[in-house]
């Protein structure tokens, strides 16, 4: 298995500098990761630097709380795509899900899917650490109904990250035709292999190089 092609090489910290982003971009070129996942402010730089390379440009929408309005998320998506993003990882409205407002949650995802249609993959971050199993299932079902390409465990900025149990539940819920992304706390090759075995088709990590090189030291970042 070519683990590198399953990894979104990620840097999303608030204090990320241009030098940090360039390092991630160069590593993505060298190790041929699936994508670089960066904050929207870095999308144009990443798109320019990765032109001609088989590495997608992934960014985040409504991140990390998911509490911005649907209209804002749709605009963010269009803006990111205009600047060169080919994948977007959006955060659901977690509070609305917990309120049982399925209509709002689905519309929130649907509008981002429509904004990205034909131009970028949409991954929906459900923030599993804040949800009951019933809520995880419902979030996945609403994501599929709204037309998302992937469901994703975590932002890496909340109270917990990916677990093999959550990945298995999400895979069972969405079936074989929707992607499942494990993110948050995936730091070693062993972590990544566990997630893939449980059903993940993509892994988000900042420790991507350590994972590929099977460096047991891994990394300390949550993402």
UniProtKB/Swiss-Prot annotation:
Catalytic activity from the UniProt record: 2-deoxy-D-ribose 5-phosphate = D-glyceraldehyde 3-phosphate + acetaldehyde
Molecular functions (GO terms): deoxyribose-phosphate aldolase activity
Gene Ontology CC annotations of this record: cytoplasm
Residue positions of the active site: 89, 152, 181
Domain of life: Bacteria
Location within or outside the cell: Cytoplasm
GO BP terms: 2-deoxyribose 1-phosphate catabolic process; carbohydrate catabolic process; deoxyribonucleotide catabolic process
InterPro entries registered for this protein in UniProt: Aldolase_TIM, DeoC, DeoC/FbaB/LacD_aldolase, DeoC_typeI
Pathway(s) this gene product operates in, as recorded in its UniProt entry: Carbohydrate degradation; 2-deoxy-D-ribose 1-phosphate degradation; D-glyceraldehyde 3-phosphate and acetaldehyde from 2-deoxy-alpha-D-ribose 1-phosphate: step 2/2
SUPFAM superfamilies: Aldolase
Keywords assigned: Cytoplasm, Lyase, Schiff base
Job description of the protein: Catalyzes a reversible aldol reaction between acetaldehyde and D-glyceraldehyde 3-phosphate to generate 2-deoxy-D-ribose 5-phosphate.
Family: Belongs to the DeoC/FbaB aldolase family. DeoC type 1 subfamily.
Record-given protein name: Deoxyribose-phosphate aldolase
Organism: Bacillus cereus (strain G9842)
